[in-house]
Amino acid sequence: KIKKVLLKSFINGALVSESNENVETFFKIKIEANNTKIFYFENSSLKFEQDFEFGTDIILRDISKITLLKKDTIKKILDQVSLNNQIPEDELVDKNFFINDNYRKIKKKLIYEIILARVIEISEIIVFKNVNLQYSTKSLKHIFLELNNEFKHQNLKEIFENTFFIKGF
């Protein structure tokens, strides 16, 4: 006879709560290459879980479409160039990033703005305009973001964190 069923999502939420001063009500957002999951915990109970069929690759594809850069070049730029809203308008990506690619004059600010626009859109879809979560976003103070292992670029993480912070978390 089965007495209890524990979901992996619930256990992960318990670990997040325990490692963050026993916070009881929060969102956990896990963003992987091709999918995103959101978990809503209220009073230490898993209340809601939803999957989305997009992830960090959508950001790389957007940058690639607009700038015509290859994925490897984009990843190098994200790893080595500081991208934020303080970038001068005329500052270009350095030539040393174009090893297997022809050099193009691409503004760092453009790459930042592409990322920011997509991150804002992602945040709205999964949290702020998600009809399944409208009642829970009003009083929520904690959100925990996990990016996939392959895509741990500090720039992207900071843009995600700043976007959620600006929206009220």
Per-region residue spans from a language model:
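Glycine-centered small-residue hotspots that permit tight backbone geometry or close packing
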Residues: L15, N34, L147-N148
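Gly/Thr-rich phosphate-binding beta-strand-loop-beta motif of the actin/hexokinase/Hsp70
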Residues: E18-E49, I63
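Generic structural marker for isolated residues within well-ordered, non-membrane alpha-helices
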Residues: A14, L60, K157
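Conserved phosphate-binding loops in N-terminal lobes of ATP-dependent enzymes
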Residues: K1, I122, V127-K129
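Conserved, well-folded catalytic cores of nucleic-acid-processing
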Residues: I66, Q80, N84, K129-L133, ...
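Nucleotide/phosphate-binding catalytic cleft detector across ATP-hydrolyzing
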Residues: K1-F26, K47, K108-Y112, L133-S136, ...
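Phosphate-binding glycine-rich/basic clefts of nucleotide- and phosphate-handling proteins
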Residues: F10, F41-E124, K138, L145-H153
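Charge-rich, low-complexity intrinsically disordered segments
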Residues: F144-F169
